[in-house]
Amino acid sequence: MIQCFDKGVFLNKGQLSATAALSAEQARENTMAWQILQAHNISGDPERQQVRFDAMVSHDITYVGIIQQAKASGMKEFPLPYALTNCHNSLCAVGGTINEDDHMFGLSAAKKYGGIYVPANQSVIHSYAREELAGCGKMILGSDSHTRYGALGTMAVGEGGPELAKQLLRNTWDVPMPKVVLVYLTGKPKKGVGPHDVAIALVKATFETGFVNNCVLEFCGPGIKDLPIDYRNGIDVMTTETTCLSSIWETDEVTEGFFKTHGRVEDYKPLHPGEVAWYDKYITIELDKVEPMIALPFHPSNAYTIKEFLANAEEILKGVEEDARRRFPKADPHLTDKIHDGGVWADQGVIAGCAGGLFDNIAEAADILRGKFTGSGAFSFDVYPTSVPVSLELMKLGATADLLESGAIIKPSFCGPCFGAGDVPANNGLSLRHTTRNFPNREGSKPGEGQFAGVCLMDARSIAATAANGGRITPATDLDYTPVHHEYHFDDTVYKNRVYYGFGKADPSVELQMGPNITDWPKMYQLSENLLVELAAVIHDPVTTTDELIPSGETSSYRSNPLRLAEFTLSRRVPEYVGRSKAVAQQEKARREGAVSDRLRQVLSRVGDADQLAGSTQFGSAVFANKPGDGSAREQAASCQKVLGGFANICYQFATKRYRSNCIHWGILPFTLDEGTPFDYESGDCVFVPHIRQAVEQGREDIPAKVICQDGSVHDLLLHVKGLTADEKEILLRGCLMNYYAARNKE
């Protein structure tokens, strides 16, 4: 079905080949990724990318912070099209006016700086970008990790907010030329197999080994031609879960048809690799052999075919329960009781967001459910189309009526089920979702209060088949139905009537509308000569997600108030983290004011003259995790640590480039350890890093440190900070990206 080959390959006239007339070095310049990147690279050095994007997108969890950063750094107008969507609208059951206050800030910013403002429930961020911004050969940057428009010929990248602030300040996205991995598609999917099935199988094959980490996936092969554009988009958006950097697909008449339908045929052009192209690795996918899939908690890679899962449900669900008990000691997870009456029964089905709520997915779900009923039991079925234009078309062709008659509920365009702000299941509920992620607590449960819910990812087709059986988990291939092909018609009337198009029309006289919850960033201090950090969280999970570092859902209500948001840092994984970090921050504040705490003096005395070191040693908190940063691009995963006085992450490997970049932009030192180095220390132990400022200035990558344990023992530890650019060094020295720009503006 899917095979990964950890060796280079030529694509020679569309065929895989071990040899070719060109050298690998010559042929690598014929990949689509190379061509698009070089067209946007202003460095003059193809190995050192300095990219300027064609457009940007942000949603309402992130755009306030980005605009505040750019404003504080001297921005006067948006220099490129920048769409502000409101699809993470939290509906604010808590917080009073703060949700709509953020939206009004966004509208006033679009008017002041010349942006595009998409009101709440008009579209989810990635649907709007596909419909209105993507174009063949373009590059788009988004402050959301699922910024992926490769199937439309657009290389798109999801990054933390500071990278978008840099673009607003007319600076560049700086990365070494990434490796390019060929994804070669053959065959045609069978009826009942949808894009999420292919995507989940791809994530399963690549995630655990990091096979495509920080690479560009380039989709080619004869299997593309039979895939509708929504099918391609549905696979493409999930490439984020492989931890790849970006993606790009060959384009054809199907792609051209998309742009014609959306009134933008000028944004289409054929994209193909050159006659001979070289790839660093390759993956083959036989689409005709893909089966309906299910991804169990707590990651899209924890996947099985649905048939395999059903045949081994008790064993698999017991494993999930054991994992949940280890992660959430206050919860009492029970999923094996879903096995009864000859099947496995779910409590909820959801089709939503940038992966699930696509027109074709919902239309085929309606085909499956036409004339059937979801039942009057516990099982519920909710459908969220990606945009109002998609909702209009579904209504016009009758799919909406079919779904409503079956017992489904049609909801507005909203990302809520994907980030814990909508359709939170009952305690010990089992939810089937065609959304992007099933990370711990991402569905909105609160394990600190004894709650647990399990989310399984499935394709819309199999969720609809399950709904037709009253919640009994069923692959769509088991049902006899006839999918009806519908020619999609895009009606942009609503966008023309409701979206504010302000690019190129900045009005400096407009005042930003600031609600009481919208606050400035607290002062951040430059890096001192020495650094002492107390371990406020030590996490030995294989991977730590950004959703664990800073939960989403109702927490996002405080997205525009750094101090209030920071109170939720690691709250669902290490509830003691905030208190520990704040205690350290208080001691650091006292130190700056000349009052050194007994605790700080005692720790410093283990590594030198405490009085002398106290004047030159910054004291902060740190997080240790094996592999932090998988998942969301939200910068808050790093900024909240810094607001609480965090100065370092220590790990064996960062899960994603974007999280490491977020740490650097907020002045958090991205320390790594050599694989195999034991780290048996506990929260409350301290790490002393002498001469850290000098080490960063000089670009030293091997940095000796001392661990001071609570029992008074001292141990050597070798830390690394590898591959910093000149700008990244300066950002760390200044304390954060905003300080860096403030200093540049004074020069």
Task: Enumerate the predicted regions with their spans.
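Fe-S-dependent hydro-lyases/dehydratases of central metabolism
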Residues: 1-747
